[in-house]
């Protein structure tokens, strides 16, 4: 386009308006970007927004310890598990770890337990749950459908707890990426809870008034990666938990119209076989026995109401975690 002609076009009212709109759009986009950056900084700072927990787990625990915060340091000081007495509660991944600890706590509180797993451990059998459903592979739709049909009656609470954690640290720069393991974690941790929930819903085992607890992890917070994973890595674990969180949020949005509540729960840092590779930081990050983690989860389920539907909660302190 000749220079003179271009100048003439820009000088017309329509062209000037278009140019102003474009400049305003660019400025608006930059303002939004700055606001998003500021929000990111707020959620990862030492003083997060009200109602949200702190990103730095070492500082979070040290602060709670110094202030002797009962919710964090002694769950029994605030714990009330009476709400599960007589309630039908299904737990996936019930044979070990936090799942087994949940079953122990639920049994102690008089819940009617429906325990699902691939293969029942002797410890689980000793609890004598009302129902043990074995052979449950959450990566199989057919297995989940079969499990749902085997559940004898509608449930009051579903705890989607089954998970998988590939222990070696993955780093692209080290050549240690394991893509098959990443897909396995995503299938079990993110798609698995959807298969279970879908099967139970369509079998009539999840109905109005039911609560669904999605046990995921703070590792699924995209916002917190700059603090908790400054060097990146551990792709499969974090991607699977972030995907699980998204699935749970979408479930919460859909099922609220059915009168069913869904909440995303980080159970806290628990001393289990799955976290054994982090044993050297258990103490400085406030890791607890699985029995304590189980109480934290049960306590939070008791606080679940429509007002808090779809929230991402840290069971250590009851505060929110940013997505």
Question: Predicted segment positions?
Answer:
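Conserved hydrophobic beta-strands of the Rossmann-like cofactor-binding core
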Residues: 88-91, 158-159
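N-terminal Rossmann NAD(P)H-binding glycine-rich loop of SDR-like oxidoreductase domains
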Residues: 95, 99-105
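Catalytic loop of short-chain dehydrogenase/reductase
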Residues: 164-186, 191-195, 201-257
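Conserved Rossmann-fold cofactor-binding substructure of NAD(P)-dependent oxidoreductases
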Residues: 136-154
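Hydrophobic structural elements of the Rossmann-like NAD(P)H-binding subdomain
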Residues: 159, 213, 262-265, 275
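C-terminal helical subdomain
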Residues: 65, 257, 264, 272, ...
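Non-catalytic terminal and boundary segments that flank Rossmann-like NAD(P)-dependent oxidoreductase
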Residues: 1-88, 322-323
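Conserved glycine-rich Rossmann-like NAD(P)H-binding loop of the short-chain dehydrogenase/reductase
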Residues: 107-124
